[in-house]
Amino acid sequence: MGNVFMKKCDDVFKIATEFIAQKKISKDYDFLIVDFHGEITSEKMAMGNLFDGYATLVVGPHPHVPTNDARVLKNGTSYITDAGMCGDYESVIGMNAQNSINRFLKKEAVKHFPANGEASLSGVVVDCDVRNGLAKNIESFIFGGSLNNVN
């Protein structure tokens, strides 16, 4: 969990640094995917750069909106700020749009309900080097629903 807007969480950068010091890709594990649940782009990008050369993929899933920045970083870690969601994009991050609008209008917490429209499947495919566990290529995808894949 990221630390920005989630203050009750442990210091994720301290924990990540300790992990990197203790574990090595291709020695302790074949591949490493860092699923970094965070609110803001800069924090996710910093985590991607911290793990560059130590992880196969750093992906940030939390805002649910796919970004167009999939790439392999200079030391071989694939990165994307947000792979998107599996859900209805004719909604508010997968939840019923009107219910979400009412939450903002009334300034009170209301229960969220999933949207019932056609779902999209969003994600990434990473081509990895089995010798070192690092990425050779990353491609994002979107299937179904109202968003069109531009790749």
Predicted ranges, named:
Residues 1-3, 33-35, 80:
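Active-site-proximal beta-strand elements of phosphoester/diester hydrolases
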Residues 1-29:
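Binuclear metal-dependent hydrolase catalytic cores centered on His/Asp/Glu-rich metal-binding motifs
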Residues 4-9, 40-44, 67-68, 147:
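Short, well-ordered, mixed-charge alpha-helical segments that flank or form enzyme active sites
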Residues 7-15, 46, 118-121, 133:
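Conserved active-site and cofactor/substrate-binding residues in soluble primary-metabolism enzymes
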Residues 27-36, 54-58:
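Short beta-strand/loop segments at the ligand-binding rim of alpha/beta enzyme cores
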Residues 33, 62, 126:
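Divalent metal-coordination and catalytic microenvironments
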Residues 41-114:
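Conserved beta-sheet core of the metallophosphoesterase superfamily
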Residues 100-151:
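A short C-terminal boundary segment appended to hydrolase-like catalytic domains
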